[in-house]
Structure formats: structure tokens, C-alpha cells
A protein has these predicted regions:
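Extracellular and organelle-lumenal recognition/adhesion modules and their flexible linkers in secreted
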Residues: 1-223
Length: 223
């Protein structure tokens, strides 16, 4: 998810993102989590689910403000990490940690002290679904998509094709869907002879030249 260009004015305390998810535990407990930013001076935002009723699906919604210390570089590296722990142990917690507020990240002060009920209960279960992160101060219903819809959206960024061969002509290889941008093409296995030209667009990949065979090729248009 592109945080830097999402529309969230993340350095302003009056601009928000909203995290929502459904969670169920076989034991009643308050579970801890945190958000961590990576770029610049790392920041942490601890939160909790509140005490869950055993074996009951509960929707958790967290509205998170921006902060002047946040930084998200405009690249494809990791910049935003989201955690929710059934049990985080004792090495990363501290009784003095304040929830629902940004502060400088430190390994030993990620969340307040976590209850041990779930951890010490044999065969305890923990389930989570419908995780959604949105710009704004309100959550919306989770958007369910069919497998075909989700696959087509993913293929805008990456696809893989196999088994093409030729003599001394050329290929025009059509992608399954129009890609986000002209991708980079990488031949993973096979051989290419005297190549005259390789061109890519958002809709196809064109190779012209001498004899060639391709067992597998990756096309990537990642952010």
C-alpha cells in the first residue's frame, strides 16, 4: 500500500487514517498491537483491541492521527508496519507505554505489558480477518472481491508467462490485463539469440531478432 501518496497528510495531527479488522479469541483478553514507521526516525503507535469476549467476533476500529515526526519516503521500500500480537512476551513491553499516541520507537517499549491468559491456555485460538487501512477518520465495510477480480488487479503489477519459441521473426506477447506502467521484462530461463529490439508497453511486450526460446519470463510494474 502506497502510504506516501495515499492522500493522508501524515505530518498533520488533524489528518487521520483508520485501521479496522475483525478478531476472535477462544479466551477473553485484551490484545496488544502497534504500528511502526521505518523511514527517518522510526516512530511507534501502540494500540489494543480492548477486552474481547471469548469465542465472539468483534470489530476493532482505530482512528490514527498524523504526527510531525512521521516520514514516508516515496519508494517501494518498507515504510509502515502493522502488528497485532496474541502474546508479545516481556522483552518488548513496558508498563509506562502510552497507547493511542505516537512516540519514538524503541525495541523494549513497543506496547504496554501484555496479559498472559491466551499464552498460558492450552489449545487457545486467535483469528483475524477483514483487515482494512483507509485514509480518513471513519471505517467502511470491508470490500469483498471475487478471485478473478483480485487476480486481475494483481496482474496490473506482475505477471509470469511460459513457453514461447521462435525462429528469426519476433514476438508480441499480450499481457493478461493492462499493466500499471510499462514493465521490466526478465527472462528467467531459456535463451535469446541475436536480439534487435525489446520494447514494452502497458499492454504487450515486443521482441524482434534472431532465433530464441523462452521457458519463463517475469513482467514487473511494481511501484
Amino acid at each position: 500500500q502506497d502510504i506516501a501518496n495515499s492522500g493522508w497528510n501524515y505530518t498533520s495531527s488533524s489528518s487521520y487514517i483508520t485501521l479496522s479488522f475483525w478478531v476472535k479469541s477462544s479466551v477473553s483478553q485484551d490484545f496488544k498491537g502497534y504500528i511502526r514507521t521505518v523511514d527517518g526516525t522510526s516512530q511507534v503507535y501502540p494500540y489494543s483491541t480492548g477486552t474481547l469476549s471469548a469465542n465472539t467476533w468483534t470489530k476493532v476500529t482505530k482512528t490514527i492521527p498524523g504526527n510531525s515526526n512521521l516520514q514516508f519516503d516515496n519508494n517501494n521500500n518498507t515504510g509502515f508496519q502493522l502488528y497485532l500480537w496474541p502474546y508479545i512476551g516481556t522483552s518488548y513491553t513496558d508498563a509506562g507505554v502510552t497507547e493511542n499516541a505516537w512516540t519514538a520507537y524503541a525495541s523494549g517499549t513497543r506496547t504496554p505489558v501484555s496479559a498472559t491468559t491466551w499464552w498460558t491456555t492450552n489449545d487457545a485460538t486467535f483469528e483475524i480477518t477483514g483487515v482494512q487501512l483507509e485514509v480518513g477518520s471513519h471505517s467502511t465495510d470491508f470490500e469483498f472481491r471475487s478471485y478473478g477480480q483480485e487476480l486481475a488487479l494483481c496482474q496490473r503489477y506482475f505477471c509470469k508467462m511460459k513457453a514461447y519459441a521462435g525462429a528469426s521473426n519476433g514476438w508480441i506477447i499480450q499481457y493478461p490485463v493492462t499493466m500499471r506502467a510499462a514493465p521490466s521484462a526478465t527472462v528467467n530461463s531459456g535463451t535469446i539469440g541475436s536480439v534487435n529490439q525489446i520494447t514494452t508497453s502497458t499492454s504487450n511486450w515486443n521482441l524482434s531478432g534472431g532465433s530464441a526460446n523462452m521457458a519463463e519470463c517475469f513482467y514487473s510494474a511494481e511501484l
